[in-house]
Every structure is written in structure tokens, then in C-alpha cells.
């Protein structure tokens, strides 16, 4: 009975014991009642309606709620952000970007009022995280990178190092690590190579792993295989420093990095010319990504199907590449609805 347990995304049905259908009926009754009486909508109802439907097979059913919600609480960053949940799922990335920009502006006002040493810092990072994600799917490097940099600016060691709040600390460090996704997504190989490693790998443990992941791919793309292999080994060594109990959003951190492991291996073998081995790794990365629990946005921000499809296409495997892209776009219903990336520029 929490937002992430209202649907089983594999069966497309509510799990046993969930009051999903009843909750949807109640929300839609309240929304309809306000409409009949020409009254302003209740933002809490619209907020819940979005959460109820984002994991369903028809998130567009909450599109009207998303459109109505944004302006109802202009100084509430989370409410400004919430429409983006639906917009991203429906491929309305420019609208998701606009919602995220509004939320980020409001959150800066709250930061100036309350400072960074509070739980709301995680919410501010969440809104920036969605901004990164939607701009990546739009193919817009500069705003995606700006959001990533703002996350890092918001999370110096004294904000992350909350020994009495390990879950919050772990969540915030996970946000910090996301910067590398943007650089890999846009092929910024030299910027990745030039990025310094974290000074405190004990505190920035996910970030350390993500740096080694990105540097492996960067060196592989530049055909510097000795350095790529060194970074690969450093990546595996860094994983041993992450507790099996460490979670990032709704998934174990090591499970999320397992997606990256197979992407890393796939890219490395591809650039070495071992295409069959590379494609096997990338297909496994796709499967691992599909097996993650839903989180908004997804914790692995670079859909493996995009890498697999592009490299298949480059080697002339046109039919499989088409199927991979069609799955990503939601055109063949092989991927659960909330795992599809409608209208994204990388698969179109």
C-alpha cells in the first residue's frame, strides 16, 4: 500500500492485498466531483492519482491530473515536480523539463531559507535527478549536465556524512554518483578521463564505482585497452567496498551497478572487436535493467537497449536492432509500460 507496491509491473495487475482499484476510483470520484461543482482541484488528490497510475499500463490516464497540479502550489517544490512523473512516462519530455525547472527554482528558495542539513535535501536532489533524466532522453547535454553539477554542489561531504542517518546519507551519495551517467550518455570521453576520483572513496563509494565504470568505457572507446582493463579491475575492487545492504532508492546498490557491469564489459569487448561476446554482455545488461524494481526516474539512467541497438546497427544487425529500439519505445509491448521510453531521440 505504498506508491511502489500498487502494481506488479510484470503481471500488469495490482499485487495481492493492494487496494489499487479502490484508491483509483476514490481519487477519480473526488476529481470528478470538484469538476462538477466548478471547484479547484485538491492537490493532494491529484498527487495521489499520479502515484497510483505511474506504474500502471495507462499512465496517460493521469495526464489531466499532471496538467492541473503544477500551478496549484507554486511554492511547493515537490508538487511542482510531480507532473514530471507522468510526462516522462508518456514521452512528454519538454513538459517534464518545464515541471522540473519550476521545482528546482522553488527548491533553491527553500535552500536559502532552511539550509541543506535536512531531509528535504533528498527531495531537492530528486527533482534535479528527474531534470537530468528527461534532458538525457531529449538529447540535451547542457541542461542535463547543469542538473548533475547542481546535485554535486548540493552534496559536499559534511552534508552526506550523516552517521546517525545512514539511509539518507546513502541516498544522497547515490544522487552524487549520477553525474557520470550524463558524460557516458553523450560520449564525453576526455571529460570522463580527466574527472578526478573522489577524495574519500569510503564516503563516496557508489561514486567511486561509477567513475571506474565510466573511465573503462571512455578508455575502451578511445582504444586505450590497457587503461580500460585497469579501470575494469578497479571497478570490481570498488564493488567490494559497498555493503550488500546498501540501497539506492528501491534497489540494492550492487544490483544497480550490476547493470553497469554488463554495459562496461559489452562496450569493452565491442571496441576490442569481440562482437558476439559484446552483444551477449549487453543483452544481459538489458535483462538486469528490466529486473530492477521501479523507481522514478530509473536508477540506471542510461537504458542498455540504447547501447545494444546502436552497436547492433553499426555491425549491420538491422532486424535485431529494430526490435531492440521498438521494445524501448513501447511499440511491441515486450517491455512493461513503466520501463518504456516513449518518443526518446536515441531510439527513434
PLM-predicted stretches and their roles:
Residues 31-38, 67-75, 113, 117-118, ...:
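Solenoid-like repeat scaffolds
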Residues 44, 78-81, 119-122, 126, ...:
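Residue register of alpha-helical TPR repeats
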Residues 52-53, 87, 135, 183, ...:
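Residue at a conserved register position within TPR or TPR-like alpha-solenoid repeats
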Residues 48, 82, 89, 130, ...:
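"A position-specific structural signal for the A-helix of alpha-solenoid helical repeats
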Amino acid at each position: 500500500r505504498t506508491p511502489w507496491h500498487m502494481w506488479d509491473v510484470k503481471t500488469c495487475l495490482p499485487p495481492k492485498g493492494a487496494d489499487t482499484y479502490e484508491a483509483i476510483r476514490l481519487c477519480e470520484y473526488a476529481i470528478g466531483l470538484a469538476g462538477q461543482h466548478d471547484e479547484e482541484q485538491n492537490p493532494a488528490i491529484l498527487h495521489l492519482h499520479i502515484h497510483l497510475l505511474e506504474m500502471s499500463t495507462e499512465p496517460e490516464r493521469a495526464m489531466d491530473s499532471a496538467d492541473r497540479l503544477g500551478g496549484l502550489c507554486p511554492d511547493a517544490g515537490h508538487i511542482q515536480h510531480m507532473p514530471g512523473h507522468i510526462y516522462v512516462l508518456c514521452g512528454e519530455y519538454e513538459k517534464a523539463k518545464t515541471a522540473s525547472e519550476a521545482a528546482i527554482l522553488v527548491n533553491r528558495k527553500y535552500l536559502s531559507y532552511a539550509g541543506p542539513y535536512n531531509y528535504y535535501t533528498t527531495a531537492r536532489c530528486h527533482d534535479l535527478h528527474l531534470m537530468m533524466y528527461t534532458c538525457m532522453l531529449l538529447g540535451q547535454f547542457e541542461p542535463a549536465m547543469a542538473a548533475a553539477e547542481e546535485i554535486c554542489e548540493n552534496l559536499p561531504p559534511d552534508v552526506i556524512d550523516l552517521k546517525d542517518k545512514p539511509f539518507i546519507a546513502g541516498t544522497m551519495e547515490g544522487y552524487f554518483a549520477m553525474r557520470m551517467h550524463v558524460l557516458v550518455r553523450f560520449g564525453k570521453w576526455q571529460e570522463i578521463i580527466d574527472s578526478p576520483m573522489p577524495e574519500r572513496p569510503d564516503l563516496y563509494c557508489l561514486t567511486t564505482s561509477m567513475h571506474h565504470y565510466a573511465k573503462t568505457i571512455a578508455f575502451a572507446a578511445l582504444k586505450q585497452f590497457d587503461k580500460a582493463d585497469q579501470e575494469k579491475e578497479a571497478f570490481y575492487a570498488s564493488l567490494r567496498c559497498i555493503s550488500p545492504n546498501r540501497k539506492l532508492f528501491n534497489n540494492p546498490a550492487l544490483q544497480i551497478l550490476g547493470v553497469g557491469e554488463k554495459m562496461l564489459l559489452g562496450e569493452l569487448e565491442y571496441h576490442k572487436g569481440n562482437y558476439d561476446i559484446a552483444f551477449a554482455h549487453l543483452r544481459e545488461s538489458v535483462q538486469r535493467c528490466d529486473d530492477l524494481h521501479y523507481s522514478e526516474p530509473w536508477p540506471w539512467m542510461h537504458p542498455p537497449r540504447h547501447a545494444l541497438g546502436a552497436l547492433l546497427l553499426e555491425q549491420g544487425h538491422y532486424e535485431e536492432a529494430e526490435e531492440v529500439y521498438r521494445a524501448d519505445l513501447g511499440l511491441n509491448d515486450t517491455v512493461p509500460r513503466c520501463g518504456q521510453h516513449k518518443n526518446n531521440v536515441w531510439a527513434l
